[in-house]
């Protein structure tokens, strides 16, 4: 279940970033500036009454660009569904997590993959 909870945490943080961007919030690409911006939003990212390190959220800014807000919302919901199905015995953990990872990868914007490949050439 640890992998599932880790995936959920990553997706949830990226969904929150995406939601803030949709509201018109702009995040700096400079980490020192971002740290100051993060103080304004840190309560939004609080998890289990703990505020994550700003650097962790800063690193997710680049990854979040590869997903749409709707895809992130759907993937967060899928994590809940997979957890429920595992706990109720509908599916086994290993294949369920594998399928979830495949869903996450399938939502990754192909444009960014092609852009990355062009940088390698």
Located regions from the model:
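C-terminal alpha-helical interaction modules of replication/initiation AAA+ assemblies
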Residues: 1-121
């Amino acid at each position: 279940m640890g992998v599932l909870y880790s995936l959920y945490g990553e997706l949830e943080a990226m969904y929150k970033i995406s939601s803030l961007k949709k509201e018109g919030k702009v995040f700096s690409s400079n980490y020192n500036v971002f740290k100051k911006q993060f103080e304004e939003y840190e309560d939004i990212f609080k998890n289990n009454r703990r505020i994550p390190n700003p650097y962790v959220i800063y690193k997710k800014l680049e990854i979040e660009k590869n997903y749409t807000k709707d895809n992130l919302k759907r993937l967060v919901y899928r994590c809940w569904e997979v957890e429920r199905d595992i706990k109720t015995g509908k599916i086994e953990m290993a294949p369920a997590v594998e399928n979830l990872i495949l869903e996450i990868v399938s939502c990754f914007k192909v444009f960014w993959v092609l852009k990355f490949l062009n940088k390698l050439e």
